[in-house]
Amino acid sequence: MSRDKQQAEQVALDVVDAVLGGAVLKDVQGISDEHMSSLYAFAFQFYEQGRLDDAEKFFHFLCIYDFNNSHYWMGLAAVHQLKQNHQKAIDLYAIAFAQGNNDYRPMLYTGQCHLALGKVGKARLCFEYVLDQATQDDLREQARVYLDTLGHIEQDCSED
């Protein structure tokens, strides 16, 4: 085996060991927080412009290089929600929710995705959870509106 190939394999093994040890690729590769913030700004700008394929690529990169940042997962999930990939969005929101400290937005958006998939019971559970657990008034109000609307729809259906 050539010396260059041995060095390349050793670098690859070192990267794998670092990642398995809990390091994120941005740190292993020496990518600064400022650079990651700039990439996030591009991703968000693409998202706002409706350039969802471009936004998806950037958010995907960000998630790979810093899998501990819930904002990156939220961005990627939001892209999939807008692209009507609701189940994928639900899965990604679950990661964002697990990593976000008392951030109940992913749970609210998961409820929206369940509604889009016609899973009213699961959506209701998400909205009830947000209403019970969230401390942000605006988030609680959004959950309450969804629950009230679902209640009115169910009442109208039972009267028919």
Predicted feature locations:
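TPR/TPR-like (Sel1-like) alpha-helical repeat modules
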Residues: 115-138, 144-151
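A contiguous pocket-lining binding segment that forms or flanks enzyme active sites
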Residues: 104-107, 116
